[in-house]
């Protein structure tokens, strides 16, 4: 006899093995089974919000079906309902996000509507998840579901063109879809700087503070631009404090961790760590293919899988360059009046040599070259020995990994035997200082750079 509660315990135990704590708390913790019809095999599950409903239907329903089959050798029919305060009720699908946001932009006349510049394409529906971004996507969806309570602030970091802005703006779109009158402010950090400077010049600081401190959701892109700007950091600190204390959601993006931003005040570094800091890394091959397929479908392009595979294999850096390669192939096909296929893609991308040009150095290659140069081994570089003959080469290898690759400090630390990012930061700082005073280290770094760049 099928016991719904026991099955749900089994299912949750399996999901805890497969998902991070962040993802589990976001999607499984507050999701409950309501009923199971033995005849139709329909299982009704209550989820917290329309966002969660869409996520379960799109990403988790198949896993639920598989686990039920493994548990009881039966194929269930899951149905997801949004739970209200008195049980499942809100079953109407929300208005399409893009249309809702357009109506808001057309009808709202206050200062927030004037400043809101969300890209209509940057929604959760158009975001392609993969291994490199699924944690960030899960966190963003959780924030969209529970702004001000889940992961506040949310700090998304990673290289250029990996989808940080897309996820950030998707949160804004979702809030406006759920609450059309919400006050959402999306800005580049440079805009905050310029607005602050202008408010001083024009003596409009009260208006400036009212704008940024009285919103429901503040989205700040490229926060690293605040580097070395003490006055701006002071102003943003007070903005942060006001919003946080009022339980308003703050989301920031950066190309690096707060601890890596030069001369960012300690109190901002500390506060940015109050919520969740999550990294987006370059997409793997499978994700790149999925991104290209989504882009092709959106643009109405007929491209077979083998051609998509080829294009994806040529660009492994970021989404922006990946989509740029597809545009180049499309343009070449239009000019030549030919169908898109592998041969045409090879011809279109021949002059780019994208992989060779953009893949850059691997940390493993840097470790190998440094180890050979100092007559040691990569195992020693990754190890824990603290003797000078090993420590200095290890620090130089970490420094070069930071200088010559796009890897974050946590990623570099992982490649050096799972060391903490603060250890990497200390090594980089030490070598940077030594380059100014130690001729021997300076010569070694110069030699190694020359070897690695050729």
Swiss-Prot record:
Spans annotated as Domain I, interacts with DnaA modulators: 1-74
Subcellular location: Cytoplasm
Region (Domain II) residue spans: 74-116
UniProt xrefs under Pfam families: Bac_DnaA, Bac_DnaA_C
Region described as Domain III, AAA+ region: 117-333
Family in the record: Belongs to the DnaA family.
Domain topic, free-text comment: Domain I is involved in oligomerization and binding regulators, domain II is flexibile and of varying length in different bacteria, domain III forms the AAA+ region, while domain IV binds dsDNA.
Name under which the protein is recorded: Chromosomal replication initiator protein DnaA
Naturally occurring in which organism (per UniProt): Lactobacillus johnsonii (strain CNCM I-12250 / La1 / NCC 533)
């Amino acid at each position: 006899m099928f016991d719904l509660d026991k099955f749900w315990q089994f299912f949750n135990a399996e999901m805890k093995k497969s998902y991070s704590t962040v993802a589990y708390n976001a999607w499984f913790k507050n999701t409950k089974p309501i009923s199971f019809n033995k005849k139709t095999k329909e299982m009704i599950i209550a989820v917290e919000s329309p966002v969660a409903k869409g996520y379960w239907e799109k990403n988790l329903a198949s896993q639920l079906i598989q686990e039920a089959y493994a548990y009881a050798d039966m194929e269930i029919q899951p149905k997801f309902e949004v739970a209200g305060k008195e049980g499942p009720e809100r079953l109407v699908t929300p208005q399409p996000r893009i249309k809702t946001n357009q109506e808001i932009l057309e009808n709202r006349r206050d200062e927030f509507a004037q400043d809101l510049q969300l890209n209509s394409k940057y929604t959760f529906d158009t975001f392609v998840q993969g291994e490199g971004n699924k944690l960030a996507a899960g966190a963003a969806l959780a924030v969209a579901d529970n702004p001000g309570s889940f992961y506040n602030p949310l700090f998304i970091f990673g290289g250029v063109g990996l989808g940080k802005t897309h996820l950030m703006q998707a949160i804004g779109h979702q809030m406006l879809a759920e609450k059309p009158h919400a006050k959402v402010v999306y800005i580049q950090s440079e805009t905050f700087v310029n607005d602050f400077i202008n408010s001083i010049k024009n003596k409009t600081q009260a208006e400036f503070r009212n704008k940024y401190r009285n919103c429901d959701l503040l989205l700040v892109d490229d926060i690293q631009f605040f580097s070395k700007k003490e006055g701006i950091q002071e102003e943003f600190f007070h903005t942060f404090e006001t919003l946080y204390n009022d339980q308003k959601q703050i989301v920031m993006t950066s190309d690096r961790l707060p601890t890596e931003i030069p001369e960012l005040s300690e109190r901002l570094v500390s506060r940015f760590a109050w919520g969740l800091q999550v990294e987006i890394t370059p997409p793997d091959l499978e994700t790149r293919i999925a991104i290209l397929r989504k882009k092709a479908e959106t643009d109405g392009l007929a491209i077979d899988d083998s051609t998509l595979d080829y294009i994806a294999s040529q660009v492994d850096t970021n989404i922006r360059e990946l989509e740029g390669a597809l545009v180049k192939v499309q343009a070449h096909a239009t000019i030549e009046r030919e169908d898109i296929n592998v041969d045409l893609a090879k011809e279109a991308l021949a002059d780019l040599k994208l992989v060779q040009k953009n893949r850059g150095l691997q940390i493993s290659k840097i470790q190998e070259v440094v180890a050979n140069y100092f007559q040691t081994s990569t195992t020693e570089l990754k190890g824990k020995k603290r003797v000078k003959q090993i420590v200095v080469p290890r620090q130089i290898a970490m420094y070069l990994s930071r200088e010559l690759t796009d890897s974050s400090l946590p990623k570099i630390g992982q490649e050096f035997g799972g060391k903490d990012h603060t250890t990497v930061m200390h090594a980089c700082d030490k070598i940077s200082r030594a380059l100014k005073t130690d001729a021997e280290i300076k010569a070694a770094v110069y030699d190694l750079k020359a070897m690695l760049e050729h």
